[in-house]
Amino acid sequence: MPIFKIRSILTALLCFQACLSGFAKIELLENNRVSFVGSGMGSRMVHYGHFETEIFLRYPNHNLTIRNLCDEGNTPGFRPHPSREQEGQYAFPGARELIHKNLQADTKPKGHFPTPEQWLSDLKTDVILCFFGFNSSFDGPNQLNRFKKELDAFLKHTKGSVYGSSSPQVALISPTAVQAIPGVTNGKYQNRNLKIYMNGMKEVAFKNKVLFVDAYTPSLNWYNEGKILSIDGALYNSDGYKKLAIFLANSLFKKSVINKKNRTKLHQAVMEKNFY
């Protein structure tokens, strides 16, 4: 095997190990109910379905239920929605005092849309995959310590809650880096903050003994391959989500793909489910 190929493989393996916090991977059991929470990176997965497909390919006989509760603008403590009362905008008790002060205003929302806690309980969630950090990173380094306190409180609350039959398994996934797109962005400013927040997330995850997946570092290597993986540098396209899906599934779960032949049909079924 050529030396450059060996080096590439070793680099990938080292990166893969470095991107995990060291805690055990998620062990999905039969009939487990999995919920995604977080902001844009997780929210946009519903449009492409690749990550869900990768999970089902690894656990074809587990009768899993997967629901995506992510939405752009969400933070660990703030989940805005105009159709629920003011206190329902916050993800857990005490969150209002921990979120950015600009998000603490009373906007007079009204309605009966379920709160984040109600969704997790109604879904009887056993496993929670958390996609936070991207929009928070735009607050800059000066807000990092506040964000870490918000994230720490969220993880402690989530790990101590019971939504299904027992406390949920929890994993935290960092944002990917911004890809340089000519005429749009070189990503340097955004990536400086994203790296700072990724490292902060890793610290908080380790403190709470939560599996952490660094998606920022490997994404930089993906961009070096020369393929456009995003529509504007930040928001992934289908190719970007395909690559991210395989990386996340390998990083989060113990099982590998059982039958790749079913990928296309399974992806079609996932997309039909997500349409409704």
Language-model segments: residues:
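A structural motif corresponding to the C-terminal end of an alpha-helix
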Residues: 123, 157-168, 200-212
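Bacterial N-terminal signal peptides
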Residues: 9-18
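Boundary at the C-terminal end of the N-terminal hydrophobic targeting segment
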Residues: 22-24
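Alpha-helix N-cap and loop-to-helix initiation/capping positions
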Residues: 142-150, 186-196, 232, 236
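Bacterial N-terminal signal peptides that target proteins for export
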Residues: 1-10
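Conserved SGNH/GDSL esterase-like catalytic core that processes O-acyl groups on lipids
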Residues: 27-152, 162-169, 176-185, 268-276
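Substrate-gating cap/lid alpha-helix
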Residues: 180-215
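Conserved catalytic region of serine esterases and O-acyltransferases that act on ester linkages
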Residues: 29, 46, 228-276
